[in-house]
Regions:
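Residue-level marker of regulatory loop/turn positions in helix-turn-helix DNA-binding domains and
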Residues: 17-21, 32-33, 43, 122, ...
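Catalytic-site neighborhood detector that most strongly recognizes the C-terminal catalytic loop/helix
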Residues: 19, 76-81, 162, 169-194
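Short, leucine-enriched amphipathic alpha-helices that occur as contiguous helical runs
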Residues: 25, 36-38, 123, 127, ...
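Conserved tyrosine-mediated DNA breakage-rejoining catalytic core shared by Y-recombinases
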Residues: 2-9, 18, 22-27, 47, ...
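C-terminal catalytic core of tyrosine-transesterase DNA break-rejoin enzymes
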Residues: 39-42, 46-53, 146-172, 179
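Phosphate-coordinating loops and pocket residues in cytosolic domains that bind phosphorylated ligands
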Residues: 30, 56, 64, 182, ...
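Active-site/catalytic core of tyrosine-dependent DNA strand-transfer enzymes
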Residues: 22-23, 89-140
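C-terminal secondary-structure termini that scaffold catalytic or DNA-interacting sites
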Residues: 4-7, 16-19, 114-118, 193-218
């Protein structure tokens, strides 16, 4: 036991915090050929939604006309910030539109209906498919929540400001969002290089020009 947590609990927490590389994501998605995980995984990877938020997604909460590829709305949450619009990427639209057409274009209802008490998929609905996808690839195991942390980390690395990050994540404050960001080594290196590109201080040419101007004024 460590700080009141079992080793298994700590391992689960570590997997939850893990940021998935783009190569790992590609391998995993290629291995997820069965529904509902095939479409759920894409939505999680490209929206940063909490898994339970995606499970509760309804057709009436999706619009195909707003934004570049459409927008989906999270209509339930513990806070007002959790209820938010999320722009769709092209591949999110592709998988959701495919399901919509396959379901005869319903105006309402669960996107992923299931024979559960809630009427929609639950963690148990995709657990075996998730485990099978991991087993079929060399990817280090992770939990589906890792997609959220990965999405938010990538969004931060792309230059999104803290307020945008919090809004997309559904966080009530930027302080909460900061806990989800784990810059990669490459991102840190790129940030330092960008900083160097701003030429903080003065280059030798700039210093020589300044000295020349000073002599002219004397």
């Amino acid at each position: 036991m460590t700080n009141g947590q079992s080793p298994a609990g700590l391992r689960g927490e570590h997997m939850r915090d893990r940021v998935i590389t783009r190569k790992e994501e590609a391998l995993y998605l290629a291995a997820t050929t069965r529904e509902p995980l095939a479409s759920v995984a894409v939505v999680l990877a490209d929206t940063g939604m909490r898994p339970e938020e995606s499970f509760r997604l309804r057709w009436e909460s999706i619009t195909w006309v707003n934004g570049r590829y459409g927008v989906l709305f999270v209509t339930r949450g513990k806070t007002a910030a959790a209820r938010r619009p999320i722009p769709m990427t092209s591949r999110v639209r592709a998988v959701l539109e495919s399901r919509w057409h396959a379901a005869s274009k319903p105006a309402e209802g669960w996107v992923w209906p299931a024979p559960t008490r809630s009427g929609h998929i639950e963690p148990s609905s995709i657990r075996k498919q998730h485990e099978a996808a991991l087993a079929a690839t060399p990817v280090t195991p992770f939990v589906t929540y890792s997609f959220r942390r990965t999405f938010l980390t990538r969004l931060a690395e792309s230059g999104a400001d803290p307020w945008t990050l919090a809004r997309v994540a559904g966080h009530s404050s930027t302080a909460v969002s900061s806990r989800y960001v784990h810059p990669s080594d490459d991102a840190l290196q790129n940030a330092i290089e960008r900083l160097g590109g701003h030429k903080i201080g003065h280059s030798e040419d700039e210093q020589e020009e300044a000295a020349r101007q000073l002599l002219l004024t004397e």
